[in-house]
Amino acid sequence: PSRGSLLGIFAYTPTLRERMEQGGSIGLIILSLGALGLLLTLWRSSYLGSVFLRMRAQARRIDRPTRSNPLGRVLLSVEGVGLEEEELLQLKLDEAVLAEIPALERGNGLIKLLAAISPLLGLLGTVTGMILTFQAISLFGTGDPKLMAGGISQALVTTVLGLVVAIPLLFCHSFINALARSMIQRLDEQCAGVLARNADLQAGG
């Protein structure tokens, strides 16, 4: 008889809807944060990907900068600066790069925040579930395990959901942050190239 009961336990797999119901309102909040983080990642990936392509195209036409990309705007910021004004040239380049950084890093902090909040909400769900379990024990005793199942399910499911959401979001944040930093580094490299070419022209002149 016990084998049949064990087989029934293994054969029953809760659906996603049932898992969400077991997690309660906290589980729903965790899943909502995960969906928000995923949407942010897709948005930032699409934006940074398009910026990367425009910057790469601009790098092939370095003598014809346009305002459609960060690199072009940085190069245009030093138009009209004389070759002899090296300090002013460097200041304008630094200012232009700093002006581009917020747009490239926008949303990264929010993705990281969502990744940090999710396991904490899972812990909150765990504590809440255990409180419900102890309340059931104090009211009805331990005679019927089904009365405690709801609280225990919430305690376990919210912990799992918090980790399931947090771990991918950490990878997403690392990917988006690395992509943004690589483009900022490319801007710095191009600025160094402008200063080097200016120094060569001064030396040649």
Task: Annotate each PLM feature.
Residues 1-11, 84:
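Extended, hydrophilic extramembrane loops/domains of integral membrane proteins
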Residues 12-16:
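Helix-start (N-cap) segments at beta->loop->alpha junctions
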Residues 17-57:
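Hydrophobic alpha-helical transmembrane segments
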Residues 25-31, 106, 110-123, 157-165:
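Hydrophobic alpha-helical transmembrane segments of multipass membrane transporters and ion channels
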Residues 32, 36-42, 124-127, 131, ...:
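Alpha-helical transmembrane segments
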